[in-house]
């Protein structure tokens, strides 16, 4: 909840200070530091998958197709139309959001529910990850309904994929 509220508050703050993604980046970095510090201080790295894998590196080659899929937005080229500061803020957001969402949905939520029922944990983690993106309709990001619904469906599918990899 804190993550969603802070990220939603960041959009109007970005506009108010006139620096695109500056508040978003600051909130993301702060939350990442707090969460990682908590996990490390309580020795929870292994529990939440933040440690060296016991799986041989060679088996990670099976994930190469996922990297190809993830790069889909770059297939037609990329143009950076941002100042270096804005680009840095956007990159910080992307990296921190990825970390935060993985730890929240796959680490905390999935791990808590999986103690009782793996099937429910997979479904709940995937669906809440997807449904969580509905906030983009209300947080001032400017996303229209159809785009947001597509994002939700895609996020549920990606959430399912990522939780099966995590498990």
Where are these regions (language model features)?
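Membrane-interface helix/loop boundary segments of multi-pass membrane proteins
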Residues: 100-126, 140-141, 164-167
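Functionally important transmembrane alpha-helices
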Residues: 148-167
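Structural signal for the C-terminal ends of transmembrane alpha-helices
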Residues: 36-45, 71-77, 165-166
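Alpha-helical transmembrane segments in multi-pass membrane proteins
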Residues: 1-39, 58-59, 63-64, 84, ...
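Hydrophobic cores of alpha-helical transmembrane segments in multi-pass inner/ER membrane proteins
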Residues: 27-38, 65-68, 97-104, 159-160
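Membrane-interface helix caps and helix-loop-helix hairpins in membrane proteins
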Residues: 74-85, 138-146
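Hydrophobic alpha-helical transmembrane segments
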Residues: 59-64, 88, 119-124, 149-153
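Aromatic-anchored segments of alpha-helical transmembrane domains
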Residues: 2-8, 67-76, 126-136
